[in-house]
Curated annotation (Swiss-Prot):
Has four distinct domains: an N-terminal nucleotidyltransferase (NT) domain responsible for UTase activity, a central HD domain that encodes UR activity, and two C-terminal ACT domains that seem to have a role in glutamine sensing. Belongs to the GlnD family. The keyword NADP does not apply. GO terms for molecular function: [protein-PII] uridylyltransferase activity; phosphoric diester hydrolase activity. Keywords: Hydrolase, Magnesium, Multifunctional enzyme, Nucleotidyltransferase, Repeat, Transferase. This is Bifunctional uridylyltransferase/uridylyl-removing enzyme. Residues 689-773, 800-869 form the ACT domain. It comes from Cupriavidus pinatubonensis (strain JMP 134 / LMG 1197) (Cupriavidus necator (strain JMP 134)).
Length: 869
């Protein structure tokens, strides 16, 4: 039998009149309900009354069309559950006793047509009882839908027959396993986190679906289908039932308001709607937080609580459905045992009787081999011990000893801290950490809430110390292996962003928090000083590496003075790599890794007493390049004509591998009449390195950037050099977001880039207008005010041009086109893309700018205009 029928147009006057009357009544009912909800915010009333209004409309349509007496109209899915959100689908089952004849098919088609005419998003199926049972056995979704079936109108006996057969056919244990697998797959789809910046309030972990899964499981097992019933059956405490009801109400309210704000079915809290949604709740922007941040923090707290209680309930239901034949326990101490790999408390009142056991739980979790999680009894005990975790508990010397011991364990720190955060213990011990739980970061490059970012940084730091992960960042792993106290770095990571969102400099405020923590926990002076220094300077190395000229000895010496010694340098380098990697998968790339490693190595040389003045670097670079050339069986003497045209600055700004590569390809093209373009897989490990050698010409840099824009390449770095005889020798690090990172696909386009770019540079056509690239949704929702800063360097020879704006396609070309228009030459370009935000730094020729103040003003104005869209 076909399960879906087409909606046929109604062609009789009585049916048209019926549809018009029912439609008008339903529309009026909806408008009244939406208006009442806007005033009262009682979501339970809204979804129930909206369901009743649709019930009445469907029943009247069913009766008005004189549907068969042996058929039934059944609500299924969420609609069957008895609640309907403003723009949700209305799922119905047209239940028949037998295969329909032609007349019945015609009636059913007219009914479906009327449903659509009523303005309902109808989802319909036509089945007999036997069809339903057969398909439910094959499809867990249909089985779940029938679990919530509710008779709307029609033949009650037929409906009862369906319900009886479905219940008899239902295997609670198999249903539990199927729904658990389905939930895990759904969680994986949403990255297994409730903290996505654009969560789905229905489907994401911690969303409404997680609550529904529990009630489906318990209903299938005959344990109840409401939080009140689960409390009465002993599966929940009264407090847990109240907490679940409260969070369910909030999530439903968010979903209902989201539908109304969007004017359509919308379950994802997209950036575009977060502000309007927050304002519908009455939130307003304050000095430190946007309205959307305040609402989203409330959402994340609710989702976190749902996730926590969901874990407890799932384990409890599993224990009831799958009782273990052997309850073998291993005694750990008088307070804890291991049961089937789970750490379990020996008394329900343990935490109230002995609050020290709260932190001992996580220390044992780290130290005890074979423990893979916390039992339902332990999770419930922690949840119900929240009132014990007060100021007195936080200041207890034994608890401070235990917490520091957790951080000092050689393994298991990441898992322990994540578990402490999931159970809210971490935020109750570190009150300032609690303040950043669920706090969003609208800086366009962090994709995690602050607490999740901090734990991600701790995780990245710990992976440097784990043998199985040494292949990921070998240099970092090498440094970590020789670092005397890795736990110090974990403490610094825990505090580096803890003061976000308070207003003021979070690095300095976080340093105060870290100093207090070190004093309270008896951390020695030397280690405490390092921790606090790391928190205060956790952004310094990234700033220097990505925004300053690392070939400038003054820059390196200044940075070396800040770090002071090798221990501070190594600690800051490891924290910086872990921090940048913990912001977003899009922010870290191999080129940034190379910049940070280069800064580390050259600073280490300075700290070791090595000279980094221009002459010594130039001499060393030439020696290294000659060695590189000989390794390639290339006679260094052949490169002398090219080197004669290169000044000291060139050797300072390029490493020996790059100089050797350029020498081998340009030694016989020193006076080439045509552009020479060479490309190779970047030595940094990602993307391409492209070299351009051509007689210098106006607009050259803009022309090259225009080519890369057209090819959708992202420029990471550019070094621009003019030889003594008037040739431009420019090198670029570029990536293509559409290509894989293994180099294979890049290798396929090397010749294409060389040919196309060389041809473009020969054409000498006028610079085309930059494309008006579109901003992403996130950038449109959280725009950055464009900023341009132009200032001379200390010598006055060059100007440093810094720009920040929302990223978009063609932005770099638009910038370089403005520079070309004003005949301002670029010497270096450091292109720093942070997610949806760009922070670019250019070193430009200062000769014309220094002589003409009006040119500076006009240049800044034109650049600001180019950054706007």
């Amino acid at each position: 039998m076909p399960t879906n029928l087409p909606a046929l147009p109604m062609d009789t006057t009585p049916e048209l009149l019926l549809a018009a009357r029912v439609r008008d009544q339903l529309k009026a009912d909806k408008q009244a309900l939406f208006a009442d909800f806007d005033l009262s915010s009682h979501v339970g009333t809204l979804v129930t009354r909206l369901r009743r209004a649709v019930d009445a409309a469907l029943a009247e349509a069913w009766r008005g069309l004189d549907m068969p007496a042996d058929a039934a109209l059944v609500a299924v899915g969420g609609y069957g559950r008895g609640e309907l959100f403003p723009y949700s689908d209305v799922d119905v089952l047209l239940l028949l006793r037998a295969e329909p004849d032609a007349d019945t098919v015609s009636r059913l088609e007219r009914f479906i047509g009327m449903c659509w005419d009523l303005g309902l998003e109808i989802g319909s199926s036509v089945r007999t009882v036997e069809d339903c049972i057969r398909e439910a056995r094959a499809d867990i979704t249909i089985q779940t839908s029938l679990l919530e079936a509710r008779l709307l109108t029609g033949n009650r006996k037929l409906f009862e027959a369906l319900r009886t057969q479905h219940q008899a056919d239902l295997d609670p244990a198999a249903f539990f396993q199927a729904k658990l697998l389905e939930m895990r797959q759904r969680h994986a789809k949403y990255q297994d986190t409730p903290y996505a910046l654009e969560p789905n309030c229905k489907e994401s972990p911690g969303g409404l679906r997680d609550l529904q899964v529990i009630l489906w499981m318990t209903k299938a097992a005959g344990l109840g289908d409401s939080w009140k019933e689960l409390f009465e059956r002993g599966l929940l405490t009264q407090r847990e039932a109240q907490e679940l009801s409260r969070n369910e109400r909030l999530l439903k309210t968010i979903r209902a308001r989201l539908h109304l704000v969007a004017g359509r079915r919308q379950d994802v809290l997209v950036f575009d709607l977060q502000t309007a949604l927050a304002e519908s709740f009455g939130y307003r922007q304050n000095a430190n937080k946007r309205a959307s941040e305040q609402l989203m923090r409330r959402y994340f707290w609710a989702a976190k609580a749902v996730t926590q209680l969901n874990s407890v309930l799932l384990l409890n239901i599993e224990a009831l459905l799958f009782p273990s034949e052997s309850q073998v326990t291993r005694v750990i101490n008088e307070r804890f045992v291991e049961r089937q790999g789970m750490l379990e408390i020996t008394s329900d009142s343990l935490y109230e009787d002995d609050p020290h056991a709260i932190l001992e739980t996580f220390l044992l979790y780290e130290r005890t081999p074979g423990i893979k999680g916390l039992s339902p009894r332990t999770l419930r005990g922690l949840y119900n011990a929240r009132t014990v975790m007060d100021a007195r508990w936080r200041s207890d010397p034994e608890n401070r000893r235990l917490f520091l011991a957790i951080l000092q364990e050689p393994q298991g720190i990441t898992h322990a801290l994540r578990l402490m955060n999931q159970t809210s213990v971490l935020g109750r011990y570190l009150i300032n950490f609690r303040r950043i739980v669920g706090q969003m970061q609208h800086d366009l490059f962090h994709v995690y809430t602050v607490d999740q970012h901090i734990l991600m940084v701790v995780r990245n730091m710990r992976r440097f110390a784990i043998v199985e992960h040494t292949h990921e960042f070998p240099f970092c792993s090498q440094l970590m292996a020789s670092f005397d106290k890795p736990w110090v770095l974990s403490v610094a990571a825990l505090f580096h962003d803890i003061a976000k969102g308070r207003g003021g400099d979070h690095s300095k405020l976080g340093t105060v928090d870290a100093r207090r923590f070190c004093k309270q926990h008896g951390i020695g002076r030397e280690d405490a000083d390092l921790i606090c220094w790391l928190v205060e300077h956790h952004l310094t190395m990234s700033h220097v590496a990505q925004k300053q000229d690392l070939t400038d000895p003054d820059v390196v010496h200044a940075f070396a003075r800040v770090v002071g010694d090798e221990r501070h340098l190594t600690a800051l380098y490891l924290l910086t790599v872990a921090d940048v990697r913990g912001t977003s998968p899009k922010v870290w790339n191999a080129w940034k890794g190379k910049l940070l490693e280069d800064l580390y190595r050259i600073t280490l040389r300075v700290l070791g007493g090595a000279r980094v003045d221009p002459h010594s670097i130039w001499a060393q670079r030439q020696e290294e390049t000659i060695s590189q050339l000989r390794l390639k069986a290339f006679d260094p003497e052949l490169g002398k004509p090219l080197w004669a045209q290169l000044d000291v600055a060139f050797f300072l700004r390029h490493d020996s591998r790059d100089i050797a590569w350029l020498t081998r390809h340009l030694f016989n093209k020193v006076d080439s009449p045509v552009p020479v373009v060479k490309a190779r897989i970047s030595p940094a490990g990602e993307g391409l390195q492209v070299a351009v050698y051509v007689k210098d010409q106006p607009d050259l840099f803009a022309r090259i950037c225009g080519y890369f824009e057209r090819k959708a390449f992202s420029i990471q770095d550019a070094k621009i050099h003019t030889t003594r005889h008037g040739y431009a020798l420019d090198t670029f690090q570029v990536t293509d977001p559409g290509l894989a990172d293994d180099g294979g696909n890049y290798r396929d386009i090397l010749a294409l880039v060389e040919h196309e770019l060389g041809d473009r540079l020969q054409q000498q056509a006028a610079l085309p207008e930059p494309s008006q690239g579109r901003l992403s949704r996130q950038s449109r929702s959280f725009p950055i005010k464009p900023r341009v800063d132009l200032r001379p360097d200390e010598r006055g020879q060059y100007y440093l041009l810094s720009l920040s704006a929302n990223d978009r396609t063609g932005l770099l070309y638009a910038i370089t086109r403005v520079l070309a228009k004003h005949r301002v030459s670029v010497h270096t370009a450091r292109i720093n893309t942070l997610g949806e935000r760009v922070e670019d730094v250019f070193l430009v020729d200062g000769s014309r700018l220094a002589a003409d103040n009006r040119l500076q003003i006009q240049l800044e104005q034109d650049l600001l205009a180019a950054l706007e869209i």
